[in-house]
């Protein structure tokens, strides 16, 4: 059975992994007959956001691995224990966690940093030419990782000019795309879809993510 790593960044759109995107990806992996292997870094979140008010919950702390375990129903690994040889493909759901906890894109834009274990695993995947999928805002993080790579990726976050502009400053090429579709970079084996960066409904987002996961699995030798 093919093993698909799913890198989570917490639990909740404003400070962690986007829950709809994560669950849709997990469902699509299962429907395709593959096994999802959930993982997350064992670090504190950048901050905690009250999802009712949208305001920062001052003084509160949450751990990315512990929060991600909610989505994974407890079946989750510390990303530091995972190597590229352990899995066949990799998926990064979106949500602000990808831009706050897996990277600092939400704060630093094109000058962001990427969590060292995320950076390591993606670079291992690139070296082994294994396929990866990035959803929603996660392509911005991928653009940073590939900033110094000889082959720059083609990515999509939909059609947001500010974010796509930052992706292109980092050297990647942005391609506009609807939430119901995906962009395939065959050379780098990276599939991306806008998800909630553009989608207005869960069904619209699901269509794009399901297509993305199916395309990702096709790329596995």
Residue ranges and their predicted role:
Residues 128:
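Short helix-loop-beta connector
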Residues 1-125, 140-156, 164-221:
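Extended, subdomain-level signal for the structured scaffold at the beginning of enzyme domains
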């Amino acid at each position: 059975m093919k093993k698909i790593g799913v890198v989570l960044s917490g639990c909740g759109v404003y400070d962690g992994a986007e829950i709809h995107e994560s669950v849709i990806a997990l469902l699509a992996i299962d429907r395709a007959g593959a096994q999802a292997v959930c993982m997350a870094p064992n670090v504190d979140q950048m901050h905690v956001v009250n999802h009712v008010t949208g305001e920062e919950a001052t003084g509160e702390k949450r751990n990315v691995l512990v929060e991600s375990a909610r989505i994974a129903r407890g079946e989750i690994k510390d990303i530091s224990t995972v190597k590229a040889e352990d899995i066949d493909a990799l998926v990064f759901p979106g949500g602000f966690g990808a831009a706050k906890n897996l990277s600092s894109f939400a704060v630093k834009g094109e000058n962001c940093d990427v969590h060292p274990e995320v950076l390591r695993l993606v670079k291992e995947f690139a070296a082994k030419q294994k396929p990866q999928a990035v959803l929603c805002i996660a392509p911005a993080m991928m653009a940073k990782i590939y900033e110094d790579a000889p082959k720059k990726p083609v990515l999509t976050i939909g059609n947001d000019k500010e974010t796509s502009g930052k992706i292109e400053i980092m050297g990647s090429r942005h391609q506009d795309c609807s939430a119901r579709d995906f962009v395939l970079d065959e050379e780098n084996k990276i599939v991306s879809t806008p998800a909630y960066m553009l989608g207005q409904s869960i069904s619209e987002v699901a269509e794009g993510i399901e297509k993305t996961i199916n395309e990702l699995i096709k790329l596995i030798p």
